């Protein structure tokens, strides 16, 4: 055995742009302290546990921003889901435990907060997840909030084949999600379960869910185990548990977004209809979670009775959410996986690669960093490989072959990001990370998560700004200059995050390279400049056209004035003067010239408008 212990973390990053510094102004307002204390000591009697509040803790940090971060902490039955925090230090919430600064980040940045939520060991979710961490970075200078939710798997110490199974399931389920969901968001999850029926008792019938049936078909094909029914049931339960956790973090993300936009921290009602989270399997738990969110929206939004009566499917819940949702995007990045492997025997990574002299270590590296070798990447669902064939493939790899060994070493050096006395750190193009360590230190994991969070948040911002640019390009080009300003600001924000990454700045740089962030930003800047230049020229043409029209009108008036002065007309002989051949010639020539000028202008303007419409349709 090469490993003493292995951990798997799934990271989902988010970012929130603030229109004003309302959030940061509220966090410094000490008038709210009495409201906070009163509000949460009321909940103490519902939860039958004391809630300790420390004025200095609230004053010196942004902890009170989190006081209503998750209103379901006071809901009925929540104590069956999460472990309550019992600590000698004051805690703001019963279930959110703040990670100390010296653990969460080596530079003790005051703008960063890390919270840990532990799953109750008696809950069915504990079979799959130990809990999750919430990483929050408040950047007042750039008016932004970014962060990640890090789900930690519950893994028992097993052999390589069992570890391979866990890694394969992780790859497969996230590949499945990526192929069926273009983003991780509350609405996307609701849409996946959209045709799931709700019976007359208000219970969600997951057996009617086509999305879950699709997953079960994939699993049955890819994992033909000898104890098929037992293993398939466990993998299906993991699928349900993962979506319960995703719904939880999407709900938390939604609440944080509202905190950033609301003018009052304490205007929400705690959920009274929260379904008891007591279920003996994750499928029933998932159904309860969907119903809980339905209750939450019904109580916290101005939903009519007619709206509630029309809820017959999960899709109808989604319609309510969409109808009463905020305008700002509420999405999480697609999953990044961090594998942390603690070695069985201490290694000296800086001077040798003895660790990879073991074939088991080589295979572990390949299946985590090069899953495509075994068909565990995006092609896993399309091809005919299954876990049994992969295990047979393991045995066929001959690392004594010089070519195979050289290829392995090249891949190892290519993906190596950091080498120290106690750690080897690798990252592949999918931003999946393998950290091989002698001693499992939480600070190492936190620093890795922070670095990936920074890089993915920049990409999320770039995508959001790109969508805003495309919208303004067609609807209001006058806003392109403001788009250019915020996009240029991304460069400085990227440098700021790189400096915040400290010793892991190489990991941050590598992640940016894999995601092609700099290229995306530069291409977007060129595109915005090009469109702004076109819009500028279009405005110049409009002004020029107006100038020409004004000149033409003025010229025509002057022309007739001139003609009138040279005509041989007198007041006494007006009738005879009109019939004078010389006057008729002057008037005819002038009329022809004016008509020719007007026709030329009309043809020119019509042609320009026609070409403008053609270009507009082509761009769309």
Curated annotation (Swiss-Prot):
Alphabetically list the UniProt keywords: Cell membrane, Membrane, Transmembrane, Transmembrane helix
* InterPro entries on file: MPN337 (IPR054979)
Its topology with respect to the membrane?
Multi-pass membrane protein
Keyword Membrane listed? The answer is yes
- The organism encoding this protein is Mycoplasma genitalium (strain ATCC 33530 / DSM 19775 / NCTC 10195 / G37) (Mycoplasmoides genitalium)
Which locations, inside or outside the cell, does it occupy? Cell membrane
Listed GO CC annotations: plasma membrane
Transmembrane regions listed in the UniProt entry: 66-86, 238-258, 546-566, 584-604
This protein's name: Uncharacterized protein MG241
Q: What is its main location?
A: membrane
